[in-house]
Amino acid sequence: MAMKFIAPMAFVAMQLIIMAAAEDQSAQIMLDSDIEQYLRSNRSLRKVEHSRHDAINIFNVEKYGAVGDGKHDCTEAFSTAWQAACKKPSAMLLVPGNKKFVVNNLFFNGPCQPHFTFKVDGIIAAYQNPASWKNNRIWLQFAKLTGFTLMGKGVIDGQGKQWWAGQCKWVNGREICNDRDRPTAIKFDFSTGLIIQGLKLMNSPEFHLVFGNCEGVKIIGISITAPRDSPNTDGIDIFASKNFHLQKNTIGTGDDCVAIGTGSSNIVIEDLICGPGHGISIGSLGRENSRAEVSYVHVNGAKFIDTQNGLRIKTWQGGSGMASHIIYENVEMINSENPILINQFYCTSASACQNQRSAVQIQDVTYKNIRGTSATAAAIQLKCSDSMPCKDIKLSDISLKLTSGKIASCLNDNANGYFSGHVIPACKNLSPSAKRKESKSHKHPKTVMVKNMGAYDKGNRTRILLGSRPPNCTNKCHGCSPCKAKLVIVHRIMPQEYYPQRWMCSRHGKIYHP
C-alpha cells in the first residue's frame, strides 16, 4: 500500500527527489520526459499567444484558396494549408471567424514541427448528404502528432442528421442500431502531448471525438452536442491510451458522454456536465471473449442531467482481464436513470446473450459523495458475475432518492466490499468500513521522495508527487530489470495511483523497463 503523505502548502515549492535504495543514497531515479510533462500539464493550459515576431508562422486557410461561404468545397485548401504549416515550428493554422468552410474527409498527418496549433474560430462543416462523402470511416483524422493543440471559439459540425435516419430499430423491446456505416467526426491516432480546448463539436454522424494509442492529452472547456435520439454519437471515446485530463467540459449527445475502452489508464475527469446521454462508461469490455484492461480512472466533480446512466462499468460475459483502481467522487445526479451501475452482463444482441463462466474482473472501485435523484427505482445496481464477483467495492456518503421523493433501492448481486458514512439506499452484503489488508510488497516502502517533478501550486489546486518502493527493491539504478515503483499524484483530496512504464537513472542516463 502506498505511503500516505499530506503536504502543507509550504512544502509545495520543495523539490521532489526519488531517492534510490538505502544501499546507494547517491543514485536518483527520474521520470521520463513524457510522464513529467503530463504531471506539469496545468502549465500548458495557458492560451496560445503569438508575438509579432511569430506572425509569419500564421497560416490562414483563406490564403490557400478556402472560401468561407458555406458552399464551396475547401478540402484541398485545408490540406495544402496543413502541409505548409506542418513544416514550420510554432506554426498556427487558422480558420477565421464569422465564416463557414465546407470540407470532405481530411487526413492531417504528422509528424510536424514543434508547437503546432490548429485554431478554429469559424465553422468547419461536413457535407449534409452522405452520398457526397469520400468515405464513411473518419471525417477529420489526425495522426502521429506531438505537442499539438486544437483550439478556438469556433464550431466543428458533422451534419449527421441524414446519417442517423433509419439507423436504429426496436427488436424485442431493445433498440438495435446499425453503426457500421457512419463516420467518426474527429479521431487522433498515435499522438502525444495534445491539447483540445474551447471548441464546440456538434452533430457527428457517429462518435464525436476519439483517441486511440495517444498519451498526455488535455481536453479543456469544450462542448459536444447532438440530439438525445441520435444513435451512437458518443462525446469522447478513449482506448489504448493513457495520461488524460478532461476538465470543465459539457457534453450532451445520444450516447456516452465519455467512454473509456480497453488498454486505457490514468484518466482524470473533472467538473463534467453530462446530459442528455448515457453517462460516463468504462467499457464495454471483454466483447467476443477478448481480454480487456482499464485502470486508474478518477472522476472528481460531475453533474448528470436526465441521463440514461450515470457512472457505468459494463463488461461482456466470456471476457477476461480487469477494470480496477477507479474512483468516482463529488457527483450530482438530476433525474438520472441508473446513477450507479456495474453490469457484467452487458449485451446488445436482439436475443438474450448466452451465460458464460469467465468475466472481466472488476475490483477496487470507490463511490464517494454521490448525491441527487434517480429516475429508476434501483439507484444503485451492482450486477456482478457469480463466477467472477466484484471485489473491494466501496460506498461512502451516498444519498440518492427517487425523483418523486420516494425511497430508492440498491440491487447487489455478487459485489463484495465496504461502506462508510451515510449510504442511502443501503446495499446488502457490504460490510461496515474496515481497514484493508496491506500488500506485503508495499507494506514498508524503502524510500519516499519529493522533488521538482510536478510539484507546484496553482490557485486552490495543489499537486505533490510521491513515490515508494517495496523493501526488496534495492539498487534500482544498477539492475537491468528494476521492480515497479508506485507513484501517487495527490489530486485535491483523493490520491490517484500511477505506475510508470519507464524509469530513467540519472547516474547512468539509461532507461529501464520495469
UniProtKB/Swiss-Prot annotation:
InterPro entries, sorted: Glyco_hydro_28, PbH1, Pectin_lyas_fold, Pectin_lyase_fold/virulence
Glycosylation sites noted in the Swiss-Prot or TrEMBL record: N460, N472
Gene Ontology annotations for the cellular component aspect, listed alphabetically: amyloplast; extracellular region
Main subcellular localisation: secreted
Name this protein carries in UniProt: Polygalacturonase
Species this chain originates from: Cryptomeria japonica
Keyword Repeat applies: yes
Family statement: Belongs to the glycosyl hydrolase 28 family.
Catalytic reaction equation(s): (1,4-alpha-D-galacturonosyl)n+m + H2O = (1,4-alpha-D-galacturonosyl)n + (1,4-alpha-D-galacturonosyl)m
One BP annotation, GO: fruit ripening
GO molecular function: polygalacturonase activity
PbH1 repeat windows: 214-240, 241-262, 264-284, 294-315, 323-344
Top EC class for this record: hydrolase
Signal peptide region: 1-22
Catalytic residues identified in the record: D255 (proton donor), H278
Propeptide positions: 23-45, 434-514
Keyword annotations of the record: Allergen, Amyloplast, Cell wall, Cell wall biogenesis/degradation, Fruit ripening, Glycoprotein, Glycosidase, Hydrolase, Plastid, Repeat, Secreted, Signal, Zymogen
Localization per Swiss-Prot or TrEMBL: Secreted; Plastid, Amyloplast; Secreted, Cell wall
